[in-house]
Amino acid sequence: MTTATISAKGYTNEDGILMSRYSIRCNDIPIAADKRPTNDVQQVAVEQFGRISARSIGEIVAVIQALEALTDASVCAAVDCVSIHVSTALAWKILTQPVSTIAVHATHARHCHEQVHNLLDKLRPSMTIEILRTKGTTVIDSRMI
């Protein structure tokens, strides 16, 4: 079994721009990575919710970008299991809970939920998907979906 490990992070840079960064590794070898500003819709989250909450949105946007990369056949050709590592409560909730658990007014989170689960549905037939919630290097919760 070949496992692809996705690490994702959202952060605001020194200019206050919401950024997302991800890496995908197989057997400790990097196979894909990217760092970029999130799109304009997500940038509104910084203005609406503040930097800390916006970082949670940035993290889930990074997960979305990584899952999009995994749908590329050249990236995932030998992968049959995906392990997604997230640290924020919002990313964990979006990945593991139904959309009904997300507040109706949290439109950014609901949009991300839809995007994530559409991508997971594409990957699920050929891959096992594991979600890990981490704090530093410690795994505090895990779930197979």
Language-model segment annotations:
Residues 60:
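Catalytic phosphate/metal-binding cores of nucleic-acid and nucleotide-processing enzymes, i.e., regions
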Residues 1-57, 68:
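RNase H-like nuclease fold core
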Residues 63-144:
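RNase H catalytic domain
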